[in-house]
């Protein structure tokens, strides 16, 4: 009977664990939906800003203008920004970013460049600090739906380093959100800036629904926002280089914000997938344990019957 009690306790523990993972899955699903909506809401502004910068750059080709954030100088020092989460329970999300950062760090060092790290998220900070990597700055406690203020504080750090020529290039490593089951670590150059458009056409969007009590995902496509071209006859009161130097920091902040938003959506999607797998595994394990319990109980009952029958035969 002790064996039966152990199995019952395991079944109870597995079912309680499944309740927790299912709740975490639903919370992550709700948050990843909000993260996606934030990206879509910010896209029209990003599109218009990118087109304006392209227009200004085109005019500056014929003028002797100075834009420090566009300066492509000889490469000696590179700053790598790695974006991870503050928490775990999200599958391989954090490990994949850390692995890609190490690979890029070694690639740059093998070419003779000095490399510094700017780390976002406790997982990256803990890993690289324990291994004595050169860390320039760290950021923690960012919201799961990143804000412009948070992106501004991160952008200002690398902005100052680039303008002071402490670093010659800034790259950001984050997880690009493709869809709910697919995320990819990518490396993008932040500085020097190269505004060439930042919105992807026909991004996948999704709707969370329920069917037979289970969470379901319906996917679809969101067409890119059609923005009218800027007229070449627009007259600016300020010179193009003044406007460009005023808008480029805003563009940099927007790029950082979009990267943080992509990373946040990827983390939440990874957590939702991990918790979904954990819930499915818990359900399967509970089913297996229930079968084991029934077999053990049946065997115990059979044994008792045999003992009673044997005792009766002995008495008779």
Swiss-Prot record:
Pfam families: ATP-synt. InterPro entries: ATP_synth_F1_ATPase_gsu, ATP_synth_F1_gsu, ATP_synth_F1_gsu_CS. It is a peripheral membrane protein. The keyword Ubl conjugation does not apply. GO terms for cellular component: plasma membrane-derived thylakoid membrane; proton-transporting ATP synthase complex. F-type ATPases have 2 components, CF(1) - the catalytic core - and CF(0) - the membrane proton channel. CF(1) has five subunits: alpha(3), beta(3), gamma(1), delta(1), epsilon(1). CF(0) has three main subunits: a, b and c. Belongs to the ATPase gamma chain family. This is ATP synthase gamma chain. The lineage of its organism: Bacteria, Bacillati, Cyanobacteriota, Cyanophyceae, Synechococcales.
């Amino acid at each position: 009977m002790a064996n039966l009690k152990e199995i019952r306790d395991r079944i109870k523990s597995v079912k309680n664990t499944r309740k927790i993972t299912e709740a975490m899955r639903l919370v992550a699903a709700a948050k990843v939906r909000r993260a996606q909506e934030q990206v879509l809401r910010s896209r029209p502004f990003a599109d218009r800003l990118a087109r304006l910068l392209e227009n200004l750059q085109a005019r500056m080709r014929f003028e002797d203008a100075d834009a420090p954030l566009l300066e492509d100088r000889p490469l000696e020092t590179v700053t790598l920004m790695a974006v991870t989460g503050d928490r775990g329970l999200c599958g391989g999300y954090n490990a994949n970013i850390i692995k890609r950062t190490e690979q890029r760090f070694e690639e740059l060092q093998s070419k003779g460049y000095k490399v510094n790290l700017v780390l976002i998220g406790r997982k990256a900070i803990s890993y690289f600090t324990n291994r004595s990597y050169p860390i320039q700055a760290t950021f923690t406690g960012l919201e799961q739906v990143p804000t412009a203020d948070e992106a501004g504080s991160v952008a200002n750090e690398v902005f100052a380093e680039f303008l002071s020529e402490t670093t010659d290039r800034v790259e950001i490593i984050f997880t690009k959100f493709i869809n709910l089951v697919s995320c990819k670590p990518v490396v993008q150059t932040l500085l020097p800036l190269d505004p060439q458009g930042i919105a992807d056409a026909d991004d996948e969007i999704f709707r969370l629904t329920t069917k037979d009590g289970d969470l379901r995902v319906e996917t679809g496509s969101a067409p890119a926002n059609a923005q009218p071209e800027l007229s070449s006859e627009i007259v600016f009161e300020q010179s193009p280089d003044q406007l460009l130097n005023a808008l480029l920091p805003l563009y940099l902040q927007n790029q950082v914000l979009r990267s943080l938003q992509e990373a946040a959506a990827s983390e939440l999607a990874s957590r939702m997938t991990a918790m979904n797998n954990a819930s499915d595994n818990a359900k399967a394990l509970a089913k297996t344990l229930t079968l084991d319990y029934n077999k053990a109980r049946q065997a115990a009952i059979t044994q008792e019957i045999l003992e009673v029958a044997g005792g009766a035969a002995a008495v008779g």
